[in-house]
Regions:
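Gram-negative outer-membrane beta-barrel transporters
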Residues: 38-40, 60-153
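A generic structural micro-environment signature
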Residues: 16, 28, 32, 44-51, ...
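Outer-membrane beta-barrel signature, preferentially recognizing the C-terminal barrel domain
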Residues: 1-33, 38-41, 52, 58-87, ...
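Glycine-rich loops and low-complexity Gly/Arg-rich segments
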Residues: 46-48, 56-61, 108, 118-122, ...
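Conserved C-terminal beta-signal and adjacent last beta-strands/turns
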Residues: 115-211
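General secondary-structure edge motif
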Residues: 2, 61-64, 110-111, 175, ...
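Structural signature of outer-membrane beta-barrel channels/translocons
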Residues: 13, 23-25, 29, 85-89, ...
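Outer-membrane beta-barrel translocator domains and adjoining extracellular loop/strand segments
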Residues: 1-3, 36, 45-51, 57-59, ...
Length: 211
């Protein structure tokens, strides 16, 4: 089989990962980390969303895209991660921000290449955490963590209809009902709402001594 005009010679999935980053101390107790990455998915094996026939029962000449259980795709993931950390005897402060893109390419039955966002393509993600240790023996620990992320992509539903199983020769449309059919929008063309979460935690340590 071929993908994007190139012969597919192996069933293995392939990817090349490029990454570069740096970490340095801004001032005492304050550390900055910056990291960029690019992942080139040369060959991916995915579930075939376009399958309409079983491979054994498909009419002669049916394209592979309409009869195979799996399909070949390519893709890329790239982005930037930035984190900042401050730490002393009482305080621990940490923040991280990620900017990311994850896209895949697939071919339709006419060998035209299409690009879509994956369902885990989150554009912005941020985490902030603060921890304070109190008490003469550091027995109290109070912490808070906040997470924010933009919504994940999803495939929207365009319409519902009654699907009649005409492949069954005994089906009578006058006396029997069909089942629910769904017409979907473009793949992952929708986006879920943004997500945020705040966790607050209080811990107390107890020390026991032997008499």
């Amino acid at each position: 089989s071929k993908f994007n005009g190139e012969e597919v010679t192996t069933k293995l999935q392939k990817a090349i990962h490029y990454i570069a980053g740096t970490e340095f101390d801004v001032v005492n107790n304050l550390t900055l980390n910056v990291e960029g990455y690019y992942k080139d998915f040369r060959q991916l094996t995915s579930m075939n969303r376009n399958q309409k026939y079983s491979d054994n029962d498909a009419p002669l000449g049916t394209p592979e895209l309409l009869r195979k259980d799996f399909m070949i795709e390519k893709g890329r993931a790239y982005g930037l991660d930035v984190s900042l950390k401050y730490e002393n005897m009482r305080w621990y402060l940490w923040g991280a921000y990620s900017l990311g893109y994850v896209n895949k390419d697939y071919e339709d039955v006419d060998k035209v290449l299409h690009t879509y966002r994956t369902h885990y393509d989150r554009r912005h993600n941020m985490n902030l955490m603060a921890t304070y240790t109190a008490g003469s023996k550091h027995q109290w620990e109070i912490s808070a963590r906040w997470n924010f992320g933009t919504g994940f992509p999803f495939t929207k539903v365009s319409a519902f209809y009654e699907k009649l199983p005409y492949d069954n020769i005994y089906f009578d449309p006058y006396t029997e009902s069909g089942y629910l059919g769904i017409i979907y929008d473009e793949l992952n063309n929708g986006q879920l709402p943004t997500y945020h979460r705040l966790d607050i935690d209080v811990k107390r340590k107890f020390y026991f001594t032997e008499n």
